[in-house]
């Protein structure tokens, strides 16, 4: 694996586990097995530039995985339940949810820089576009589909954060349980 890719992969895992501010430069260097010069060679603007690269990498990974799941299941409900079941399985197997949430990486940053905010917003826009398209394919209006997509993003992201905070997969199970009613009620609009 190329050095830059290895740095991004290692830093992404560290940022997801400990948050952006929870990972110091020395820890990054040690875990990535690189020198400070190597880090700044690949990321001249330092740790924030690395965070943005991690967010872009996560964006590709998350949207690719969601697209794969959604292409495999014919209905929004089945696809969403499969996605949540996968998240629950990962949490129950490892005690964490790596690779699907960015809030742990940036939540402690009261004021995000514009490039970090843009990278986060892009990820959410991309996942919401996948949700929205699946809903429109099922006959939801564009307006309803977009509203449900935002709500679904908030439910899933919130469910993941609650799983971590409560040390339980129950919050995501609850999200999965309320989805059928949410979709039925919204389709009536």
Task: Put a short name on every predicted segment.
Residues 78-82, 93-115:
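Amphipathic alpha-helical segments used for helix-helix packing
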Residues 113-114, 124-148, 186-189:
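Hydrophobic alpha-helical bundle segments that form small-molecule/ligand-binding pockets
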Residues 6, 10-53:
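Helix-turn-helix
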Residues 67-94, 149-152:
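Hydrophobic alpha-helical connector segments
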Residues 55-61:
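Short, basic, alpha-helical segments at the C-terminal edge of helix-turn-helix-like DNA-binding modules
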Residues 103, 143-162, 174, 178-181:
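Hydrophobic alpha-helical segments that form the core
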Residues 21, 71-74, 139-146:
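Short, charged helix-capping/linker segments at alpha-helix termini
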Residues 90-93, 111, 133, 153-170, ...:
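Amphipathic C-terminal alpha-helical segment
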């Amino acid at each position: 694996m190329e050095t830059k890719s290895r740095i991004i992969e290692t830093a992404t895992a560290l940022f997801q586990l400990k948050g952006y501010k929870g990972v110091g430069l020395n820890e990054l260097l040690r875990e990535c097995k690189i020198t400070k010069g190597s880090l700044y060679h690949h990321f001249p603007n330092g740790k924030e530039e690395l965070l943005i690269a991690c967010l872009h990498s996560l964006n590709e990974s998350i949207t690719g995985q969601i697209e794969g799941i959604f292409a495999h299941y014919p209905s929004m409900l089945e696809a969403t339940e499969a996605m949540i079941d996968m998240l629950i399985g990962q949490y129950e197997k490892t005690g964490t949810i790596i690779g699907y949430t960015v809030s742990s990486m940036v939540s402690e940053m009261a004021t995000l820089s514009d490039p970090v905010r843009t990278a986060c917003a892009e990820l959410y826009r991309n996942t919401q576009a996948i949700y929205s398209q699946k809903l429109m394919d099922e006959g939801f209006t564009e307006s309803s589909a977009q509203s449900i997509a935002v709500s679904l993003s908030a439910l899933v992201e919130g469910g993941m954060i609650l799983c971590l905070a409560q040390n339980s997969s129950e919050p995501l199970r609850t999200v999965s349980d309320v989805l059928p009613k949410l979709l039925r009620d919204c389709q009536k609009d």
